[in-house]
């Protein structure tokens, strides 16, 4: 299986690539790009993990999840209590379970200069 990780900070992408190389992990691709809309070229995915909060579950990311796939996503407004949700896509829609309260940075569009 293959893992794709999208990073909007060049320094973090470079660090991740070096660490994976040092650990001899070869099934992970680190992409330096805007991940706001997911990664449609390799969709659909078995699993999706968002590591930044969204105000609501993005339909364009759900569309990249296979039926039977699982997404972990922090949902909520900035600087407020957010919920970490487990979303399972099934034939009829979504099965959503709240896992815990969390606080994540808000998801942003674009690349950072650093």
Question: What residue spans do the PLM features occupy?
Answer:
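Conserved nucleotide-cofactor-binding alpha/beta core module
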Residues: 1-81, 85-94
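Core SAM-dependent methyltransferase catalytic element
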Residues: 83-114
């Amino acid at each position: 299986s293959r893992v794709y990780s999208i990073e909007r900070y060049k320094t973090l992408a470079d660090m991740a690539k070096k660490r994976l190389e040092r650990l001899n992990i070869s099934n992970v691709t680190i992409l330096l790009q805007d991940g706001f809309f997911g990664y449609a070229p390799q969709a659909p995915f078995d699993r999706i993990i968002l590591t930044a909060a969204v105000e609501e579950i993005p339909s364009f990311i759900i569309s990249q999840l296979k039926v039977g796939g699982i997404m972990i996503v922090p949902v909520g407004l900035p600087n407020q209590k957010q919920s970490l949700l487990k979303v399972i896509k099934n034939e009829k829609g979504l099965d959503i379970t709240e896992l815990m309260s969390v606080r994540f940075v808000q998801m942003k569009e674009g690349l950072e200069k650093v």
